[in-house]
Amino acid sequence: MKRIYKNFYAAHQIQAKDIAQLKQEKFECVLCNRPDNEEQDQPSVEMIKSQCLANGIEFLHLPITPGDFNLEAIMETEKVLKTAKKTLAYCRTGTRSTMLWAFAKTKDLEVDEVLKITDHSGYNFQHLKELLETYKSTSS
């Protein structure tokens, strides 16, 4: 798990047994950016969701396949960020979740700052700079 910015964290696939630890760490929301059955050994969304709800953690499912970013997922991520809840977003490696954060955060931060933050977190998205700038200019 990597802290990306303030109360937003990204991680690779989590397991049902991880949810109790997330509760202890005061996470309020888990955001799954993975479609079911992406890999054979992947726990189902329902399994993770039921553990989250049993532990009083909000659960949202915004599945994104690699390379398939859409406006709806970005806008829903923006809504999550506006709540300021301590949130863990996950996918297979954390990359898609962090990319969604990057697009959503261009509303509040300059693109260079977003790229600096993601790079510091271990995700180099320099190849997305032009796309992030275009999104920022059209969504303001």
Regions found by a protein language model. Give the residues of each.
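A phosphate-binding catalytic loop at a beta-strand-loop-alpha-helix junction
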Residues: L88-T98
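Cys-dependent protein tyrosine phosphatase-like superfamily
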Residues: M1-L88, A102-S140
